[in-house]
Amino acid sequence: MQRILDLRRIYALTVDPRALHGSVWKVDFKVVRQELIRYIKDLALFEGEFILSSGQKSSYYIDLRRVSLDCRAAPIIGKVMFDLICDLQDVDAIGGLTMGADPIACAIMHYAASVGRSYNAFVVRKQKKTHGLARLIEGPDIRGKRVVIVEDTSTTGNSPITAARRAEETGATVAAIAVMVDRETGARQAIEKAGYSYYAALRVTDILDRGTAD
């Protein structure tokens, strides 16, 4: 029953911008963040032996698409990630490397619209299309726009850095890179070394029951 009550408060906030004002917003954001952690633990956390996309081995795997594509969790992600980046000035669009970034960008876009903010979403392909318009970046044109690159989780920072470079090659300005879960394995350092501001909604140690990440 507590899960249901929490979700009702969260969904109320996603449709009523007036609820964002005052101390109630600060309290409810903590509730939303904890609810997101619970969803990740319940739906997306697996223990065992895994090879990550970076090639590194891990004793756990967080399959965030099980959360970001879940109809109950997506509005929560939108709210948490919006709060993470909403103070960045003059941002026009949100996107990243397909496919981990895609549902994150769309969740932010929809939540932002519900509170009167306008962010377009875009998708950075891994390879340029060879037919049609042969685009590398799908969605509204980001040429001359200020964008935030998002990712569900990052180990080395390579995926969001790749997306950022491709956005810049298209003519966009990258305001920041924001990830939902930082695995605390060097992504922050790599992204900041590459010259980008870095934001993370959660650390992997917020999710794992043990004190440090493997």
From Swiss-Prot:
Entry's EC annotation: 2.4.2.10
Molecular-function GO terms, alphabetical: magnesium ion binding; orotate phosphoribosyltransferase activity
Protein name: Orotate phosphoribosyltransferase
Known partners and oligomeric status: Homodimer.
Reported cofactor(s): Mg(2+)
First-level EC class: transferase
A Pfam family that the UniProt record links to this protein: Pribosyltran
Taxonomy, superkingdom: Bacteria
Known function: Catalyzes the transfer of a ribosyl phosphate group from 5-phosphoribose 1-diphosphate to orotate, leading to the formation of orotidine monophosphate (OMP).
Source organism (scientific name): Tropheryma whipplei (strain TW08/27) (Whipple's bacillus)
Keyword Ion transport set for record: no
The entry's keywords: Glycosyltransferase, Magnesium, Pyrimidine biosynthesis, Transferase
Gene Ontology biological process terms, A to Z: 'de novo' UMP biosynthetic process; pyrimidine nucleobase biosynthetic process
Classification via HAMAP family: PyrE
Family annotation (PANTHER family): OROTATE PHOSPHORIBOSYLTRANSFERASE, URIDINE 5'-MONOPHOSPHATE SYNTHASE
Record: residues binding 5-phospho-alpha-D-ribose 1-diphosphate: R125, K126, K129, H131, E151, D152, T153, S154, T155, T156, G157, N158, S159
Catalytic activity: orotidine 5'-phosphate + diphosphate = orotate + 5-phospho-alpha-D-ribose 1-diphosphate
Pathway involvement of the protein, from the record: Pyrimidine metabolism; UMP biosynthesis via de novo pathway; UMP from orotate: step 1/2
Gene: pyrE
Homology family: Belongs to the purine/pyrimidine phosphoribosyltransferase family. PyrE subfamily.
